[in-house]
Swiss-Prot record:
Protein name: Podocalyxin
A GO term from the CC aspect: endoplasmic reticulum
Entry domain remark: Both the O-glycan-rich domain of the extracellular domain and the C-terminus PDZ-binding motif (DTHL) in the cytoplasmic tail harbor an apical sorting signal. The cytoplasmic domain is necessary for the apical membrane targeting and renal tubulogenesis. The cytoplasmic C-terminus PDZ-binding motif (DTHL) is essential for interaction with NHERF1 and for targeting NHERF1 to the apical cell membrane. The extracellular domain is necessary for microvillus formation. The large highly anionic extracellular domain allows to maintain open filtration pathways between neighboring podocyte foot processes.
Tissue expression summary: Glomerular epithelium cell (podocyte).
Native species: Homo sapiens
Gene expressing this chain: PODXL
Phosphothreonine modifications at: T518, T556
Bilayer topology term: Single-pass type I membrane protein
Annotated function: Involved in the regulation of both adhesion and cell morphology and cancer progression. Functions as an anti-adhesive molecule that maintains an open filtration pathway between neighboring foot processes in the podocyte by charge repulsion. Acts as a pro-adhesive molecule, enhancing the adherence of cells to immobilized ligands, increasing the rate of migration and cell-cell contacts in an integrin-dependent manner. Induces the formation of apical actin-dependent microvilli.
Amino acid composition bias (Polar residues), ranges on this chain: 32-50, 83-107, 143-173, 190-204, 270-302
Localisation: Apical cell membrane; Cell projection, Lamellipodium; Cell projection, Filopodium; Cell projection, Ruffle
Record-linked Pfam families: CD34_antigen (PF06365)
Length: 558
């Protein structure tokens, strides 16, 4: 698309018949009268509303015929103007609260030296002592070629007196700005700037009108229109930067949104950038336009500084643009130490019956801040909660300072605890029954569920099985013991029975023992045992018999 536009512009340049150069004349020519706009534009133009800024630029230059070899070298250099800022004290820029009158910016090309001159005139009448004075600064540039109405080619060496002037009328709106300190750097009337080539668009000598309002910005040019809503900045200077042979890039120092083209068939593409593009090789010095959130700063030859955004609220309307400042109320002093903080408040009237905790400090109060205050706050928080953990606990203390003394009243101590989800789950797990009564039906933490589902399903049957087996083992042991005792008793009884049968049959090993026949004379004798018990058995040990019995037995036997 851009290549097609460049080719069409080149064909237009080649198809134009060459015109003879006009001789320089000290008197103003009709082309000069047509192209020159007087600086007293405020008398000829209708008064503009306070919310709008109108820039009128008249340009009636026609195509200039140059050889084909120089078609790609149509250049014009623009010198960046330097804004001088005067203030009451160094390093401070004070913007006017209300400025009335137009600000005239005249760009005059030609003259005795043949160099274009840029002049900025500041308004004389102000309504406030705190004003920003824009010093008049003149910068000259040596153009390669200039164009006039009749299409003749004028060079810088011709020394012609024909002028090509552009008058810009600016009306600033009523606005109140804060005083912002800025570092100042020495300014010189002329600073070395690098020239920027500008490609001259093909035009038929129409008047160009560019109008910028506060609520909606409109750039009106015959053939195409650009619209940008919500523009509140004042356009002081426009810098044209060469992009290609048939392309123009419109750069402004304020923050302007990119404008979209609404018509087709134009030979020059215009782009509005959001900030001034600056490089160290092409533009060592730049000019800054004041906007609603920026203040004018003196620029040094190497850098262009931008002021930080002022703490204010912008309110724009279709009729007037106003700036409203919000000054925050003075907050109560708060001392913050990592996660702990102490807030001081005014002492309120309390009833006599209410008891207050009063701390009389020897050093600085808790409202002043310091290392001792951090230690004191930590001690108070640990006293309130024994398990105070700074990693997950935040302690806040509300104090009331007594004016004229170092006494503070402790009104409230708050400790916020941030527990991990796992700790909360473990604590709620122990109170699951109460949670169910309160209306909680389920609780999950990842794969873990309520305590009932987390328990072992086989725990109760296992316990029952173990108890049953233990009882069975005890029963088996009891039966074994009973059976073993019975068997032993039976064996003893069988042995005694066999002995009795042997003795009764006369088969015994002791020859002295002999079974005597029972007679009426012989009575059963009861032998006293060794332990003093009477013996019921007929079988009596031989040792228990007396000597007399033994003699009688022997005699009887014989």
């Amino acid at each position: 698309m851009r290549c097609a536009l460049a080719l069409s512009a080149l064909l237009l340049l080649l198809s134009t018949p060459p015109l003879l150069p006009s001789s320089p004349s000290p008197s103003p020519s009709p082309s000069q009268n047509a192209t020159q706009t007087t600086t007293d534009s405020s008398n000829k133009t209708a008064p503009t509303p306070a919310s709008s800024v109108t820039i009128m630029a008249t340009d009636t230059a026609q195509q200039s015929t140059v050889p084909t070899s120089k078609a790609n070298e149509i250049l014009a250099s623009v010198k960046a103007t330097t804004l001088g800022v005067s203030s009451d004290s160094p390093g401070t820029t004070t913007l006017a609260q209300q400025v009335s009158g137009p600000v005239n910016t005249t760009v005059a090309r030609g003259g005795g030296s043949g160099n274009p001159t840029t002049t900025i005139e500041s308004p004389k009448s102000t309504k406030s002592a705190d004003t920003t004075t824009v010093a008049t600064s003149t910068a000259t540039a040596k153009p390669n070629t200039t164009s006039s109405q009749n299409g003749a080619e004028d060079t810088t060496n011709s020394g012609g007196k024909s002028s090509h002037s552009v008058t810009t009328d600016l009306t600033s709106t009523k606005a109140e700005h804060l005083t912002t300190p800025h570092p100042t750097s020495p300014l010189s009337p002329r600073q070395p700037t690098s020239t920027h080539p500008v490609a001259t668009p093909t035009s038929s000598g129409h008047d160009h009108l560019m109008k910028i309002s506060s609520s909606s910005s409109t750039v009106a040019i015959p053939g195409y229109t650009f619209t940008s809503p919500g523009m509140t900045t004042t356009l002081l200077e426009t810098v044209f930067h060469h992009v290609s042979q048939a392309g123009l890039e419109l750069l402004t120092s304020g923050d302007l949104p990119t404008l979209a083209s609404q018509s087709a068939g134009i030979t020059a593409s215009s782009v509005i950038s959001q900030r001034t593009q600056q490089t160290s090789s092409q533009m060592p010095a730049s000019s800054t336009a004041p906007s609603s959130q920026e203040t004018v700063q003196p620029t040094s030859p190497a850098t262009a500084l931008r002021t930080p955004t002022l703490p204010e609220t912008m309110s724009s309307s279709p009729t007037a643009a106003s700036t409203t400042h919000r000054y925050p109320k003075t907050p109560s002093p708060t001392v913050a130490h990592e996660s702990n903080w102490a807030k001081c408040e005014d002492l309120e009237t309390q009833t006599q019956s209410e008891k207050q905790l009063v701390l009389n400090l020897t050093g600085n109060t808790l409202c002043a801040g310091g290392a001792s205050d951090e230690k004191l706050i930590s001690l108070i928080c640990r006293a309130v909660k024994a398990t105070f953990n700074p990693a997950q606990d935040k302690c806040g203390i509300r104090l009331a300072s007594v004016p004229g003394s170092q006494t503070v009243v402790v009104k409230e101590i708050t400790i916020h605890t941030k527990l991990p989800a796992k700790d909360v789950y473990e604590r709620l797990k122990d109170k699951w029954d109460e949670l169910k009564e309160a209306g909680v039906s389920d609780m999950k933490l990842g794969d873990q569920g309520p305590p009932e589902e987390a328990e072992d399903r086989f725990s109760m049957p296992l316990i029952i099985t173990i108890v049953c087996m233990a009882s069975f083992l005890l029963l088996v042991a009891a039966l074994y013991g009973c059976c073993h005792q019975r068997l032993s008793q039976r064996k003893d009884q069988q042995r005694l029975t066999e002995e009795l049968q042997t003795v009764e049959n006369g088969y015994h090993d002791n020859p002295t023992l002999e079974v005597m026949e029972t007679s009426s004379e012989m009575q059963e004798k009861k032998v006293v045992s060794l332990n003093g018990e009477l013996g019921d058995s007929w079988i009596v040990p031989l040792d228990n018999l007396t000597k007399d019995d033994l003699d009688e037995e022997e005699d009887t036997h014989l």
